[in-house]
Amino acid sequence: MAETLRWGILSTAGIACKNWEAIRNSGNGVVTAVASRDAAKAQQFIDGCQAEVPFEDVPRAIGGYDEIIAADDVDAVYIPLPTGLRKEWVIKAANAGKHVMCEKPCAVSHADLMEMTDACAANDVQFMDGIMYVHSDRMPKLRAALDNPSNVGKITRIASAFSFCAPPEFLAGNIRLSSELEPAGCLGDLGWYTIRATLFVMNFEMPKSLR
């Protein structure tokens, strides 16, 4: 693979704007294409992102997802589609030899997630989820602090919570309130963070019980 990682964004979800910026700021990534079911919507997304965080070579707009999966100038795809739609496109991307970054929660079930990660492993491509804080410079420092017995004793219980105040416009139409598109609801959307943090603290030792 070339030193520059060429990204395709599969969907024009709002969170994709943040990752467009992250790719631009990474120093070794570029966005080469954005796909939506409607090419005009993809172009509108590109125009908005280019106005704020421009790439030297403007990414192209694609109508439909299959074309971006098959594109020769895309090494990796970012998939912020609703959870209920992700499995199909993660597997298609893996089978096309593309690395995958998938928003969380990655799948609607453990079985689906195993199919997705197995497809990536079989095609020797990377699979990552969209939890940003695990890549922060703070995490190695936190790991070192937790592993120092003079700082923390034996951990036997962890309580965690994550919430936000949803405004009326969120409650009126955000896809995260759709049981079909987001069947795990707030547990999948927010619980993914707290569960990941808990597992990190425990060095990914599985819990004995949950309440």
Where are these regions (language model features)?
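Rossmann-like NAD(P)(H) cofactor-binding subdomain of soluble oxidoreductases
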Residues: 85, 105-109, 128-135, 140
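Rossmann-fold dehydrogenase core element
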Residues: 115-133, 153-157
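Short, Asp-centered acidic motifs that coordinate Mg2+ and/or phosphate
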Residues: 33, 76, 157
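Alpha-helical elements of Rossmann-like donor-binding domains used by nucleotide-donor carbohydrate transfer enzymes
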Residues: 18, 44, 64-67, 76, ...
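Predominantly a Rossmann-like dinucleotide-binding segment in NAD(P)-dependent oxidoreductases
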Residues: 133-211
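Beta-loop-alpha module in the N-terminal Rossmann-like domain of NAD(P)-dependent dehydrogenases
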Residues: 56-119
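N-terminal Rossmann-like dinucleotide-binding module
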Residues: 1-53
